[in-house]
């Protein structure tokens, strides 16, 4: 079975740490790269990342370092940073020697900024000719770190690379599917947090379970609309496509939209029950990915003259007049 011999994970938050734990299930040479010296020491000595994952134990052979000078030596580098930090992270890693010789698996969800575009398009500028894949799935970080059953989609223009990564990550408890449609997977990952806000608002307004189920069908159509505009293979007129029904799209949507454990659903719910929307938005301090993604996707809707009613409805709630 074709696999990568060594794997680096860049990003020491909950998702990055859980992905490192996942990768270590099938690979004995996995290193988590992060900036926080205290967390690095904790993982090294205690095999926990209490700040992000509580007392969940990480694999004993998982390595950790803050020394970026060696990251260039890893065949596969998983990028798991917030969307706002994507550009700076790639630029930083370039100064430490990563190149087109390394394969990148992008687990970051959202859009690149200034200008608004997909991460795959931004990488054409930041790291030309790089071999790149994208990861998305119905994955809560703590459940992933506990090795509970889960699944994900892996997309790459080079399907052999996607399959190779799948070989590294698949196990009895973690299943994968692969695709060459990198656009649809990125679009779904970027939009799902916006739709989760809508789900939270519907919950607050007591719209009922039927409405929340109908929301999933409707938002799949909007994912397809934007995907098609950006060059994906999903069609807004034909949702009977494999990728839309896989873990990285509908699976991720259901998990995010139906769980109050999702920051975005929780935000939407609290916004929906607030008596003064403007005060709530001004005083809400927690990072909400969907709120940030919404501002960016509106640029794309305007650019391509798209009709996406759910996005527009959320914008009316979230963006102050």
UniProtKB/Swiss-Prot annotation:
Residues where sn-glycerol 3-phosphate binds: 109, 137, 192, 252, 262-264
Residues reported to bind NADPH: 14-15, 35, 109, 141, 263, 287, 289
UniProt pathway: Membrane lipid metabolism; glycerophospholipid metabolism
Keyword hit for Nucleotide-binding: yes
Keyword line: Cytoplasm, Lipid biosynthesis, Lipid metabolism, NAD, NADP, Nucleotide-binding, Oxidoreductase, Phospholipid biosynthesis, Phospholipid metabolism
Family annotation (PANTHER family): GLYCEROL-3-PHOSPHATE DEHYDROGENASE, GLYCEROL-3-PHOSPHATE DEHYDROGENASE [NAD(+)] 2, CHLOROPLASTIC
Sequence similarity: Belongs to the NAD-dependent glycerol-3-phosphate dehydrogenase family.
Protein name: Glycerol-3-phosphate dehydrogenase [NAD(P)+]
Underlying gene: gpsA
